[in-house]
Amino acid sequence: MAKITKTFQYGKHTVTLETGEIARQAGGAVIVKFDDTVLLVTAVAAKSAREGQDFFPLTVDYQEKFYAGGRIPGGFFKREGRATEKETLISRLIDRPIRPLFPEDYKNEVQIIATVMSMNPDIDGDIAALIGASAALSLAGTPFNGPIAAAKVGYKNGEYILNPTVTDLKDSQLELVVAGTANAVLMVESEAELLSEEVMLGAVTFGHREMQKVINIINELAVEAGTKPSDWVAPAKNDGMIAALKEAVGDQLASAFQVRDKLQRRDAISAIKKDVLGALAPRATIEGWAAGDLAKEFGELEYQTMRGSVLSTKVRIDGRALDTVRPISAKAGVLPRTHGSALFTRGETQAIVITTLGTARDGQVIDAVSGEYKENFLFHYNFPPYSVGECGRFGAPKRREIGHGRLAKRGVLAVMPSLEEFPYTIRVVSEITESNGSSSMASVCGSSLALMDAGVPIKAPVAGIAMGLVKEGNDFVVLSDILGDEDHLGDMDFKVAGTAEGVSALQMDIKIEGITEEIMKQALQQAKAGRLHILGEMAHALTTPRQELSDYAPRLLTIKIHPDKIREVIGKGGSTIQAITKETGTQIDIQDDGTIIIASVNAIAAQAAKSRIEQITSDVEPGRIYEGKVAKIMDFGAFVTILPGKDGLVHVSQISSERVEKVGDKLKEGDLVRVKVLEVDKQGRIRLSIKAVEEGEGVPASAE
């Protein structure tokens, strides 16, 4: 195939899609250029599904190579290792809008690999990777109901910005990524500075409108490349088996969905499934019905029963009305030795959230392609298997946990103080102890309380809520505070976090086409009402940050010295600073501009370290009297330490008004003496006098 190139303007970027020259053995391969940021994106689909495969094995890997930024990786091995948090998040970003566009029965393995090969630090690779994945799938001839496109939207001075650069985003009130087909929005991911629902919805529609040109370009590329449509055919439905299953189930599932408790409902449905499949086993053997097919169709009946019940009765499976939020319990200060903690329970979803305060030194150093930087606000989300009553793998966080942690972090980011306002590294950990839907939003609520309990001066409390949708034809219902089953069996997962003032984070995943702007508008308004209700319930626990830090949290003292004095504080080989930290039990961070931050759980120790540093950095003033210690005896006089690191000479003639034959007769090493500073010469040498003090000259150094 000859090389095919498509170039177009997308926001302020010139975008080029190329195929036919590189990675020609892949099912589909595209070079995507956003100015100097260049990615190779490939898509490969297996020819057939594995025997017994009962799920769609789609894997997406986004990777940033260090050579793309002209850097060599750190570490011992000097090569890229496991995926970074950013790579994991962008992999999920690509996966989410693509997965629902494959047919339900398609079980062939599909792998998408997006490799950043050249990176302009001002142009991120996320939108290029999404566009490249869509183009590669379109070229691979898979049964992919695309193409999709993506756009990033910023917001500044009341104007939307298409595909803002990293620099643009620094003073943008919004960073929103939207992906979708020509007719529908499928995915939204965003963080915002407390914007209104109208502005957020406007950004989604703006991005969807602007991405249409990309969809047209991908279609043209596929046509010119001569891509053949997929020959995959969905397996035929076994109508006899489905009819027999429906007859055997009868109205048992409808009754089971009336059970309000999650675990009891799950047990009831499992019992029905076991009985029905057992009753049908003899006929299944005769007819040749596979057990997997029966189980799949039973799941389809579950899906239809729950959806039909909600649409017809407007009552949900736990008995709530469509817009009712589950009962909420919120407590702050639940763990005695942590710096801040909260327990947030909403129905059968529960999170214990802990805040820990550290110094700037505790920040996480990120070794990225665009350069090294430090992260001083960390948010970690843990989802242990016991939270849903199961046994399972326990260890390193999975992709889902990283994604949920990032969403919860986005929820509170807009209200966090700057490092200048609150010079602590802050780590928030959300431990999900129970889960029945919306655990990431429970993490937002719990983190808001835990931060306030720790005394972090957040601008306002934050709450989050997950919305759902059930839609059949023109009939639809929007659900507030969805359960796990409603998320699994519904058409939309729509998470909104924010304060009473506005939205701080929005995440949307839509499984169907046909969701209109009006439906999204209703969902946002219903979410706002739910969010305000949750904030009201949280107010029973805590409404403002505590004025005092925990007794176990480090106290920070900040002082400023002249940058030229830094070497005096550090001392030869770090001896001075090490002595201060060892003697006072403090942690001291020195910045290049002369800012010194002293951290200690003990306020008295911090003050002692501060005094030591002030003594070291204070200038010796001629005419002042200091109390010093005799450091060394010489034939011609004695050296006296008057400040840490500052020795002066008392000449033999300045020891006493009487004649001194031998210095050792008057002074001994270790003696405390009062001396007057006679002179500090250009070389910094200090001349001292004991005699002048005895004669009543000089002013004490402590006097102002």
Swiss-Prot record:
Entry's EC annotation: 2.7.7.8
Organism in which the protein naturally occurs: Xanthomonas oryzae pv. oryzae (strain KACC10331 / KXO85)
Top class in the EC scheme: transferase
Cofactor(s) listed: Mg(2+)
InterPro entries: ExoRNase_PH_dom1, ExoRNase_PH_dom2, ExoRNase_PH_dom2_sf, KH_dom, KH_dom_type_1, KH_dom_type_1_sf, NA-bd_OB-fold, PNPase
Gene name tied to this protein: pnp
Function of the molecule: Involved in mRNA degradation. Catalyzes the phosphorolysis of single-stranded polyribonucleotides processively in the 3'- to 5'-direction.
Annotated compartments: Cytoplasm
Name of protein: Polyribonucleotide nucleotidyltransferase
